[in-house]
Amino acid sequence: MIYKAIEQTVQAVQITPDIDMIAPDWFTKKMNTEEIMIDRAQRDGAISVIGCTIYFNARRYKGSRLVARIGDYIVKDSVGRLNVVRKNDFDRLYKKEEA
C-alpha cells in the first residue's frame, strides 16, 4: 500500500512552565471548559507545572485522555481535534508557516 502524508495547517502550542500566561485563545477556552487541565506538582514548597492532560467528552471516547509533558506540543487540526505530539516528532512533521 502506498500512503501520502496529509498536509494541513494546524495550530500548536508548546507546553512550558509558563503555559498559563502564553496560551492562545483556543487553548484557554478548552481550559475554561475543563477539556484541558494543567498538571501541577508541589516540590520544596513551590508549585510548578509538569504538563497538561486533555480529556475527551464525546461518548465514543468517554474517559479517554492524552497527557503532555513539558516540551511537548498540543496540536489543534483544522477540524478542531486535539492531539499531543512529542517535540522530536513535531520538529520532523511540521514546519512554521510564514505569516
Predicted regions and their residues:
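Short, compact, well-ordered microdomains
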Residues: R60-A99
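N-terminal non-globular leader segments, chiefly Sec-dependent signal peptides
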Residues: M1-R59, G63
